[in-house]
């Protein structure tokens, strides 16, 4: 419902028939008067320029030609001789004019093709035959009906008798299916069907009462059906006829409040009919069902013509007597802008209304329940999640029934096969064969090297496998052979023969692993092999001291004799006798050995490199080798680590070596070293390091494959590279038994790049239908990874598993128990609920206690999505009407549909029906006290309640869109958004008392719009704070309420006659208001109570109840009769003037007054745009995550009939998320409570959630906004959603 362009003319019009950019021809409307009182008449052409975004809404004509008379109708048809076609005009003078559109556009002087005057009076209607474009039917005054052939304009023929008729032919239409059938409608009420072939009447419809016919239109698909319209004010109806029964219409469409002037039936969709009329409205109907889809923006004067575009029915045009032709579309694309304009206009004060109100016309919005036929597709298909294609095909051509087919689909079958092969090999545990296959099929040396290293790690001795992979196995064999030649490993012989092979000790070749330089011999202590035999005698006697010894020799000898090996070692080292020192150290033990080794290495400054290596091995300081050895010998370093490193240091040493290699890559750019660094990381089980290298290699290999590939798609190449990466990581994790210690972290993961690859791979395999495989890899990603969480839930939904969410980190917020929170006295309902209990005495802080609990939730069968129905005021002293919301006695059980309305919940009850009383009779009063006389120039004051306070979202707010908002009344209508009061037809919040004594009943058929000088109705104000008197409503006249849910203020009416039924719509500023009070608003003060007690305005505001009813969209049930008001005087002064009061200064902590005298400060602009969720702090993120997920669950399962209510709740929740993102409005303790509320909803502990909600709403109202209502509704909707 967007106005695309406007033509500033009061004119009849016709669309161009071509498929090119649409043009409109306009002819000055006969009898219309322009604003400048010009009598100029002309034919003009207008280019809509819909493709030009810079074009203004108001157009300028592209061609113009003057005429001698005004137009009653225009028609435009194709022509073989004229590319743009021919325009025909029926003039008021009776002339028929024909123009060449091409020549009009070019400005040629001979644009007029013909001008004939066969008609004796004005031509009222004309139309070209849709199948034979050369045939033109014209009808006019005195019943004249001519058929003209453009090929022979001089000889038209007349249908019917030549005798003059008293009625005029007002409209006509060719049958869309049968070319020679024509229908006409006359001012006398005759609807005649003509057979042009026989030139006779075929049928006359029995138009009951012979009411004038203003418009006729044939059904575009059924040749026997047509619609007619009547222009009468008293009975503006549209009749749908079937020629097979001409005695009575098949259906009657009612909705216009004044005569209907024009009809247009869409050629592309027979379910769309436009009508316009004297009530300034254009309505869209479904003529097949009689349902009104809605109305388009109301203008300021009669809409006398409306037409669909014949080529593109997305557009239509409507002409009105306000001097404009509006070109509109049926698709609304700017609802937010329209709402903003409407809200701005609605909030204007009465004094400055005409100075500040915008000139935009009314905004109206509605949605078609189904797509128009030209947007429907006979077949469609879409890719579904999980490797599925969903296709829809019609069961039969021309029908609407469709068949849905779901078929599996794989983008690349090789991906699915390779995934299945790899997963099956994993299940069998045959990792060796996987590695061998990948080594064989590897495309690059780096890939092959990685798999060989992984294969080496699979061996029984991973370090030995790595040594062999590095090529050091042969060198160990060579050393072994060299040592054998020296006799160091020669085995003892038994009886001159070599000992059996199996008898060789395991330490014989222990040097291969070089565990210790002193452990190469099988004899751990060769001195122990010397026999200590008593009778051992030798032929080689010696002297301990022979007199030639040096002093050092003597000292060493004495130390040895005393067994002081350490002192002997010191003397040997002092004399630099290294050989003797080592021998003494061997006898002296480990401490002496280490001392000898240290002294030895300190002396070897110019020794070979192997001595430093030996020093590192002996000193268990392999870090010296890792950090200081030249990287050209990285393999030797790696072998040394595999041979000598302790188990606890091995991984870190390999990691350090890999880091040195990576640093060299960055310094030199030599990417060939990457595989060396990769080996180091693999040996050290450093997955986070090796994954980065693998991902870089994957990217390069993928790019190279894409450049050289001839047939494979880039997707297939990418998926294969991703598959290879995932396989390497998976095998490596199993080989090293890798445990991810960061799965419980919230952020800053070392393996974040791997997690991204897991998520991508899961999406790929899920697309190929392997959902279980996708779930397996997503389970390797931390639970709090945002993308993985979405992907996991998506897969679980596809597998029909319950979606779960990881609990956020434990907050320090207090845990709210299930018991209700203590409530202050002002919000406590009475504790006595017995039906027979005496009404409690009211206090100064609470309203009178009802005998029955007015806030008790209805039975479980109540509908949480049901729209509310207005009920009587529970605070009125009169007895409340029957509760229309209470479930019937036979309420459905819990197992029934939770969305089904309860029995009788939609049946009109006494509280909903208008009061039926005699015309002019006074309404019943309370206690026989007559109301005070009504002032003649000022509206009575209204009692402000919590629900009518300005800018305060009330606890019982309802979803938007249930009814229309009041429209500001002025010369040019203000924009009016499609949001309206939730209490349609409610009573005006003014006294409806009888006239003063002595004044008899007066009959007033309607109340005209108030003149400019009359003050508007009083503004709804906020409830005054405790101890604060409300502002005098008569001292300052406020504008209408800005609260979209407030009651509609109206002037008091006199009569009580029921208005005629009409379709829902926004009130027009040019229509008179209703003449009777609509059904009352249950939350508005009763007229009698208000009139009877002037002091009532000084009472404290009525607080919201501590607990809402079970229905999130319905107000609580009405209460029982209340106790008498202790503040009301027994006999109010009937003529007491209102007191002139000024609101006193507010006390600390009181709610700021929102009276009309106080200007509301404009809020500061938000830090971040609406919809942004990236700045929600971590402590508040559970609110967003849990409530969003639950809202989506409710949204996906709620019935479509409640879409508006669900969407409204979601919109209100987005307000909360915006506040959280901007970190405004909500204080930290409220955020903590909301986290607890969200977790209660997640755990389906709705009582706790409701208790927290009431606590926040009651004690922290300054932090509550529109979002609070959305939370309340989500709690109720979630509770009943399975």
From Swiss-Prot:
Quaternary context: The COPII coat is composed of at least 5 proteins: the sec23/24 complex, the sec13/31 complex, and the protein sar1. sec13 and sec31 make a 2:2 tetramer that forms the edge element of the COPII outer coat. The tetramer self-assembles in multiple copies to form the complete polyhedral cage. Interacts (via WD 8) with sec13.
Keyword Phosphoprotein: no
Composition-biased stretches (Pro residues): 921-934, 1006-1021, 1030-1043, 1071-1080, 1101-1120, 1129-1146
Biased amino acid composition, Basic and acidic residues: 491-505
Cell location: Cytoplasmic vesicle, COPII-coated vesicle membrane; Endoplasmic reticulum membrane
Molecular-function GO term, any one: structural molecule activity
Name of the protein in its database record: Protein transport protein sec31
Family as reported in the entry's similarity comment: Belongs to the WD repeat SEC31 family.
Membrane topology: Peripheral membrane protein
InterPro entries associated with the record: SEC31-like (IPR040251), SRA1/Sec31 (IPR009917), WD40/YVTN_repeat-like_dom_sf (IPR015943), WD40_repeat_dom_sf (IPR036322), WD40_rpt (IPR001680)
Gene designation: sec31
GO term, biological process aspect, one: protein transport
WD repeat placement: 7-47, 66-109, 118-158, 164-204, 208-251, 255-295, 298-338, 382-407
Biased composition range(s): Polar residues: 801-815
Keyword line: Cytoplasmic vesicle, Endoplasmic reticulum, ER-Golgi transport, Membrane, Protein transport, Repeat, Transport, WD repeat
Coiled coil (UniProt feature): none
Recorded GO CC terms: COPII vesicle coat; endoplasmic reticulum exit site; endoplasmic reticulum membrane
Region (Disordered): 491-511, 801-845, 906-1176
Gene3D superfamilies assigned: 1.25.40.1030, Functional domain of the splicing factor Prp18 (1.20.940.10), YVTN repeat-like/Quinoprotein amine dehydrogenase (2.130.10.10)
Biased composition, class Low complexity, residue ranges: 973-992, 1084-1100, 1152-1162
Principal subcellular localization: membrane
């Amino acid at each position: 419902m967007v106005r695309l362009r406007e033509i500033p003319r009061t004119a009849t019009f016709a669309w161009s028939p071509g498929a090119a950019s649409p043009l409109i021809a306009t002819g000055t409307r006969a009898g219309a008067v322009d604003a400048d009182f010009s009598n100029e008449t002309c034919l003009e052409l207008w280019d809509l320029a819909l493709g030009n975004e810079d074009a203004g809404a108001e157009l300028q004509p592209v061609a113009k030609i003057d005429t001698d008379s005004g137009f009653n109708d225009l028609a435009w048809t194709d022509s073989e001789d004229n590319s743009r076609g021919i325009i025909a005009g029926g003039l008021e003078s009776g002339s028929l004019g024909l123009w060449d559109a091409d020549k009009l556009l070019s400005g040629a002087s001979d644009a007029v093709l013909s001008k004939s005057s066969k008609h004796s009076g004005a031509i009222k209607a004309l139309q070209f035959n849709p199948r034979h474009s050369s045939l033109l039917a014209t009808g006019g005054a005195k019943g004249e009906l001519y058929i003209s052939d453009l090929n022979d304009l001089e000889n038209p023929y007349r249908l019917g008798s030549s005798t003059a008729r008293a009625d005029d032919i007002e409209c006509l239409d060719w049958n869309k299916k049968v070319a020679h059938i024509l229908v006409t409608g006359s001012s006398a009420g005759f609807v005649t069907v003509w057979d042009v072939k026989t030139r006779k009447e075929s049928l006359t419809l029995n138009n009951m009462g012979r009411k004038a016919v203003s418009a006729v239109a044939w059904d575009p698909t059924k040749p026997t059906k047509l619609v007619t319209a009547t222009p009468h004010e008293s009975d503006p109806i549209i009749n749908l006829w079937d020629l097979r029964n001409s005695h009575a219409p098949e259906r009657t469409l009612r909705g216009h409040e004044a005569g209907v002037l024009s009809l247009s039936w869409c050629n592309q969709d027979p379910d769309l009919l436009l009508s316009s009329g004297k009530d300034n409205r254009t309505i869209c109907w479904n003529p097949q069902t009689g349902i009104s889809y809605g109305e388009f923006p109301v203008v300021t004067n009669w809409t006398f013509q409306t037409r669909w575009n014949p080529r593109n029915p997305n557009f239509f045009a409507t002409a009105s007597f306000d001097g404009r032709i509006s070109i509109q579309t049926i698709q609304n694309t700017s609802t937010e802008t329209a709402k903003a304009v409407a809200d701005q206009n609605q909030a204007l004060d009465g004094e400055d209304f005409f100075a500040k109100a915008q000139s935009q016309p009314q905004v109206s919005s509605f949605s078609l329940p189904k797509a128009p036929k030209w947007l429907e597709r006979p077949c469609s298909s879409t890719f579904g999640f999980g490797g599925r294609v969903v296709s829809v095909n019609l069961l039969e051509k021309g029908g609407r029934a469709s068949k849905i087919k779901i078929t599996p689909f794989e983008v690349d079958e090789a991906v699915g096969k390779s995934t299945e092969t790899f997963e099956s090999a994993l299940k069998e545990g045959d990792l060796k064969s996987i590695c061998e296959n990948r080594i064989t099929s590897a495309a690059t040396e780096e890939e092959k090297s990685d798999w060989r290293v992984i294969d080496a790690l699979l061996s029984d001795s991973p370090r030995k496998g790595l040594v062999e992979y590095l090529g050091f196995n042969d060198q160990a064999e060579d050393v072994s052979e060299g040592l054998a030649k020296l006799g160091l490993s020669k085995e003892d012989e038994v009886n001159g023969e070599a000992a059996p092979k199996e008898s060789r000790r395991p330490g014989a070749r222990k040097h291969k692993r070089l565990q210790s330089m002193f452990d190469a011999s099988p004899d751990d202590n060769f001195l122990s092999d010397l026999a200590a035999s008593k009778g051992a005698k030798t032929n080689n006697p010696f002297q301990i001291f022979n007199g030639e010894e040096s002093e050092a020799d003597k000292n060493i000898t004495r130390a040895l004799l005393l067994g002081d090996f350490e002192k002997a070692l010191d003397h040997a080292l002092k004399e630099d006798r290294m050989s003797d020192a080592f021998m003494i150290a061997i006898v002296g033990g480990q401490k002496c050995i280490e001392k000898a080794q240290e002294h030895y290495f300190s002396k070897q400054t110019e020794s070979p490199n192997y001595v430093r290596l030996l020093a590192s091995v002996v000193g268990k300081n392999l870090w010296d080798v890792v950090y200081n050895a030249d990287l050209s010998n990285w393999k030797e370093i790696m072998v040394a680590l595999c041979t000598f490193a302790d188990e606890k240091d091995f991984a870190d040493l390999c990691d350090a070596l890999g880091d040195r290699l990576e640093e060299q890559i960055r310094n030199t750019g030599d990417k060939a070293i990457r595989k060396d660094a990769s080996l180091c990381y693999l040996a050290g089980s450093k997955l986070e390091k090796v994954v980065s290298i693998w991902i870089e290699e994957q990217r390069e290999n993928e790019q190279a494959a894409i450049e050289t590939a001839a047939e494979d798609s880039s997707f297939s190449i990418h998926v294969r590279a991703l598959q290879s990466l995932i396989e390497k990581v998976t095998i490596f994790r199993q080989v090293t038994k890798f445990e991810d210690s960061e799965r419980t972290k919230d952020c800053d993961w070392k393996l974040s790049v791997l997690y991204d690859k897991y998520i991508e791979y899961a999406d790929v395999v899920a697309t190929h239908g392997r959902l279980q495989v996708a779930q397996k890899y997503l389970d390797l990603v931390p639970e709090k990874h945002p993308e993985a969480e979405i992907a996991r839930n998506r897969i679980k939904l596809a597998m029909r598993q319950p979606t779960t969410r990881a609990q956020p980190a434990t907050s320090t917020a207090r845990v709210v128990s299930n018991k209700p929170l203590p409530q202050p006295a002002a919000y406590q309902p009475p504790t006595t609920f017995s039906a027979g209990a005496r009404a409690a005495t009211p206090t100064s802080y609470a309203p009178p206690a009802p005998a029955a609990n007015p806030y008790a939730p209805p039975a479980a069968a109540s509908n949480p999505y049901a729209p509310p129905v207005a009920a009587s005021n529970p605070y009125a002293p009169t007895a409340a009407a029957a509760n229309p919301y209470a479930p019937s006695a036979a309420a459905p059980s819990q197992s029934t549909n939770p969305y089904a309305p309860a029995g009788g919940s939609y049946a009109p009850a006494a509280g909903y029906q208008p009061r039926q009383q005699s015309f002019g009779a006074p309404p019943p009063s309370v206690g026989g006290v007559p109301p005070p006389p009504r002032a003649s120039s000022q509206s009575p004051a209204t009692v402000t309640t919590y629900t009518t306070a300005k800018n305060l979202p009330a606890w019982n707010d309802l979803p938007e869109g249930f009814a229309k908002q009041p429209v500001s009344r002025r010369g040019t209508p203000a924009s009016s958004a499609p949001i309206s009061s939730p209490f349609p037809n409610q009573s005006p919040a003014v006294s409806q008392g009888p006239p003063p004594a002595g004044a008899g009943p007066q009959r007033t058929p309607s109340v005209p719009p108030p003149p400019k000088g009359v003050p508007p109705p009083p503004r709804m104000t906020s409830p005054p704070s405790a101890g604060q008197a409300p502002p005098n409503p008569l001292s300052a006249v406020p504008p209408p309420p800005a609260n979209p849910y407030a009651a509609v203020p109206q002037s008091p009416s006199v009569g009580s006659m029921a208005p005629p039924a009409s379709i829902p719509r926004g009130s027009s500023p040019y229509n008179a208001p209703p003449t009777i009070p609509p059904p009352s608003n249950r939350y508005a003060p009763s007229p009698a109570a208000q009139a009877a007690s002037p002091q009532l305005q000084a009472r404290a505001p009525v607080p919201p109840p501590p607990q809402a009813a079970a229905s999130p969209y319905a107000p609580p049930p009405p209460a029982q009769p209340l106790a008498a008001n202790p503040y009301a005087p027994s006999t109010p002064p009937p003529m007491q003037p209102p007191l002139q009061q000024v609101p006193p200064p507010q006390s600390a902590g009181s709610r700021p007054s929102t009276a009309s005298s106080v200007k509301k400060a404009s809020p500061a602009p938000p830090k971040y745009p609406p919809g942004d969720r990236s700045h929600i702090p971590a402590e508040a993120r559970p609110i967003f995550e849990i409530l969003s997920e639950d809202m989506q669950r409710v949204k996906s399962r709620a019935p479509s009939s409640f879409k508006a209510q669900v969407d409204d709740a979601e919109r209100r929740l987005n307000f909360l998320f915006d506040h959280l993102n901007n970190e405004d409005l909500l204080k930290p303790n409220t955020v903590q409570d909301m986290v607890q509320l969200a977790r209660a909803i997640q755990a389906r502990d709705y009582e706790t959630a409701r208790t927290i909600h009431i606590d926040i709403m009651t004690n922290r109202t300054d932090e509550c906004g529109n979002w609070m209502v959305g939370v309340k509704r989500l709690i109720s909707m979630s509770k009943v959603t399975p």
